């Protein structure tokens, strides 16, 4: 089973409406949709977000740098999801193709794209912070496109091995949750994913239009 996981906040709620409409129209094969928002934004959510979809809504006591906090929440999405797989969707993802998302997992392996850092342009900015997280050199960038699907087990294992993950993220100054997840899985859970180097990968049209919201979801 696959749960759809969205971390959002008040500035992205209008965009979230369109995201949810596109999920309702185009996506099948998921177990549930989980949305996590700051507690302080709950009333705004109630007034802005309108959907016929059954949503499992969680509110959290957000603090400090919201951009970093939302990344910690994504790193610990297993706390809110029950399924074997978690599909990350941001509020500014608008799906435009019909798909059963079960087809995105082949033989128990979701696809994760990666590109050598020498070829990623401005995304080189994520290299140093990911290396700090890994405590090792990282050669590849893993935040190639959304949606991304990860094993729930991967997230839970990372948190178990790094019980101070919240402090690590919140005090990092700069962090990239999807690069951290990708780099860790590439080393420790490689057999659980289909890692595809974009040098050898045959281009496939993305499932969604990725818009630019407010740099934190």
Report each predicted region and the residues it spans.
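Short, acidic, metal-binding catalytic loop of nucleotide-sugar glycosyltransferases
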Residues: 21-30
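Short beta-strand/turn micro-motifs composed of small residues
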Residues: 6-8, 37-39, 213
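Active-site-proximal specificity loops/subdomain of glycosyltransferases
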Residues: 38-80
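Short aromatic/hydrophobic "clamp" motif used to bind/position activated sugar donors
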Residues: 86
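N-proximal low-complexity "stem/linker" segments adjacent to membrane-targeting elements
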Residues: 1-18
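Conserved donor-nucleotide/metal-binding helix-loop-beta segment in metal-dependent transferases, i.e.
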Residues: 95-129
